[in-house]
Amino acid sequence: MLIPRRVKHRKQHHPKRSGAAKGGTTVTFGEWGIQALTPAYVTNRQIEAARIAMTRYIKRGGKVWINIYPDRPITKKPAETRMGSGKGSPEWWVANVKPGRVLFELSGVTEDVAREALRLAIHKLPLKARIIRREGGE
């Protein structure tokens, strides 16, 4: 699972989810990609579940790129704890995904295999997304 090795600050403010993605909006490495249409926090478990769904479907063929990284900690206070006494401890890590961001890329497989693998991965993610193809000459 994707977790930062070390961070400057253990606890952070929640990132803003509004606005469109500034970079990473085109397919760069592979031939096919998943592009987010709505904003969301994608956890490290969801990224791993989508990756496993894709790689199991394409079996040994093709290559997968993960273009997002969960670098923001989300904290949580224990159950039945009174309010106050500081912020809770970090529980999981999220990637702040904005609309237009390409999350995963895939190449080295046929079109129907790529579309089905990416469709399976989209179902594991907490956002609306679409499958896009690389533009320009291959």
Curated annotation (Swiss-Prot):
One GO MF term, please?
rRNA binding
Show the Gene3D superfamilies listed in the entry. Answer: Ribosomal protein L10e/L16
Q: Please give the InterPro entries that the UniProt record associates with this protein.
A: Ribosomal_uL16, Ribosomal_uL16_bact-type, Ribosomal_uL16_CS, Ribosomal_uL16_dom, Ribosomal_uL16_sf
Which PROSITE patterns is this protein grouped with?
RIBOSOMAL_L16_1, RIBOSOMAL_L16_2
Keyword entries, A-Z: Ribonucleoprotein, Ribosomal protein, RNA-binding, rRNA-binding, tRNA-binding
Region (Disordered) residue spans: 1-24
Q: Pfam families given for it?
A: Ribosomal_L16 (PF00252)
Oligomeric form and interacting partners:
Part of the 50S ribosomal subunit.
**Protein name per UniProt:** Large ribosomal subunit protein uL16
> Which species is listed as the source?
Micrococcus luteus (strain ATCC 4698 / DSM 20030 / JCM 1464 / CCM 169 / CCUG 5858 / IAM 1056 / NBRC 3333 / NCIMB 9278 / NCTC 2665 / VKM Ac-2230) (Micrococcus lysodeikticus)
